């Protein structure tokens, strides 16, 4: 195993231990752990990453709407990826889009709101 692979393995191990070892892990650390773990187990960790990103945006960045928006956009991307990997995950994507939409509305981003509304409507009619 080369040093890069060893470091990556060590980081993954630390992330797993952090998530398993603490019931009160700060959401920032939770997000960091899920971002790592999703690389090796996307089916297991994409839904958790999407939820943790939303919580992180809400808890830590309510006063920074631009950062909160970026985190919610990342949550939508994780949910989209999950939907692509496994059928029946549209509720995850729907939830992420609704949360993203709320942040767009807060920032009065009308053009992006229209696109998100269209995607939500597609999901509501059996799309994706």
Mark where each language-model region is.
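N-terminal alpha-helical interaction modules that lie
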Residues: 1-40, 118-128
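Surface-exposed polar/charged interaction patches
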Residues: 18, 37, 59, 63, ...
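Flexible helix-coil transition and linker loops at the boundaries of alpha-helical arrays
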Residues: 34-46, 78-91, 126-128
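A generic hydrophobic-segment detector
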Residues: 101-128
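Helix-turn-helix repeat elements of alpha-solenoid scaffolds
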Residues: 20-35, 64-79, 109-118
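Amphipathic alpha-helical repeat scaffolds of TPR domains
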Residues: 2-20, 43-62, 88-107
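Heptad-repeat amphipathic alpha-helical coiled-coil interaction surface used
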Residues: 31, 37, 49, 56, ...
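Charge-rich, low-complexity amphipathic helices
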Residues: 52-60, 67, 75, 119, ...
């Amino acid at each position: 195993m080369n040093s890069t692979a060893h470091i990556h393995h060590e980081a993954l191990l630390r992330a797993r231990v952090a998530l398993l070892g603490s019931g009160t892990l700060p959401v920032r650390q939770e997000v960091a752990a899920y971002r790592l773990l999703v690389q090796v187990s996307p089916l297991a960790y994409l839904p958790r990453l999407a939820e943790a990103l939303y919580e992180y945006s809400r808890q830590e960045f309510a006063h920074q709407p631009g950062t909160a928006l970026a985190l919610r956009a990342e949550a939508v991307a994780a949910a989209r990826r999950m939907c692509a990997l496994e059928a029946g995950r549209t509720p995850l994507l729907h939830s992420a889009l609704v949360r993203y939409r709320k942040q767009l509305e807060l920032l009065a981003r009308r053009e992006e709101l229209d696109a998100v509304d269209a995607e939500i409507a597609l999901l509501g009619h059996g799309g994706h």
